[in-house]
Amino acid sequence: MGKKLVMAQKRGETRALCLGVAMVMCAVIAYYILGTTMLPLYQKSVWTQKSTCHLIETNIREQEELEGKKVPQYPCLWVNVSAVGRWAVLYHTEDTRDQNHQCSYIPGSLENYQVARADVEKVKAKFHEQQIFYCFSTTRENETTVLYRRLYGPQTLLFSLFWPTFLLTGGLLIIAMVKINQSLSILAAQR
C-alpha cells in the first residue's frame, strides 16, 4: 500500500511540475508577443499630455473634394478644438488619424450608409452636449492634432500584461509548492 501511494504521489508531482512549467512557458511566449506588438506602439505614442479641449466646430463631411483627394463613400466627422492654447484637429484614436487624416471620427460600420450617418450624428451631438472635455496632446510645439482617446496608453499596457503575469506567478507557485512538498516528504522519510 505504501509503495502505491509513493508512486501516485510521484506521478501527481510530475504532472503538477509539467503544468507549472507549461504555464511559465506560455507566460514567456505571451510576454514576447506583447513585447513585439504592444510595447512599440506604446513607445511610439507621442500623445502623453492630458489637456482640456474646448470645442470650436464640428462638421459632417460627405463625399467632397479635400486637398485633391476624394473622401471615401462614408460620412466622417471633422472636429476642431482649442487645446493647450492653440487650434487643433481632434482625432478619436491614433488609428483614426492613420486611416484618414481628413476625418476626426470614422463610424464603426461602413457597410450601411444610413447606420454610419446615424452613428456620426450621435457622436456630433455628444460633442455639442459636452463642449469642454479631456483630450491628449503632444509636447511638440508645431503639432496641430490631439486625440480624444489613447489606444496605447499605460492602462492598456498594464491590462495586457495582467494575464501573462498571473500565468507566470501561478506557474512559479505550482513549481514551488511541488518542490516544497518533495523536500518535506524527503525529510519525513529520513525520520
Curated annotation (Swiss-Prot):
Could you provide one GO biological process annotation from this protein's UniProt record? detection of calcium ion
Give the record's membrane topology.
Multi-pass membrane protein
Q: Which residues are on the Extracellular side of the membrane?
A: 37-157
GO CC: one term? voltage-gated potassium channel complex
Q: Which residues lie on this side of the membrane: Cytoplasmic?
A: 1-15, 179-191
* Main localization, broad class: membrane
Write down the InterPro entries for this protein, in alphabetical order. K_chnl_Ca-activ_BK_bsu
Q: Name one GO molecular function term.
A: potassium channel regulator activity
- Membrane-crossing segments per the record: 16-36, 158-178
Post-translational modification comment from the UniProt entry: N-glycosylated.
Subunit structure, interactors included? Interacts with KCNMA1 tetramer. There are probably 4 molecules of KCMNB1 per KCNMA1 tetramer.
Question: What is the recorded function of this protein according to its Swiss-Prot or TrEMBL entry?
Answer: Regulatory subunit of the calcium activated potassium KCNMA1 (maxiK) channel. Modulates the calcium sensitivity and gating kinetics of KCNMA1, thereby contributing to KCNMA1 channel diversity. Increases the apparent Ca(2+)/voltage sensitivity of the KCNMA1 channel. It also modifies KCNMA1 channel kinetics and alters its pharmacological properties. It slows down the activation and the deactivation kinetics of the channel. Acts as a negative regulator of smooth muscle contraction by enhancing the calcium sensitivity to KCNMA1.
Identification of the protein by name: Calcium-activated potassium channel subunit beta-1
Q: Which gene holds the coding sequence for this protein?
A: KCNMB1
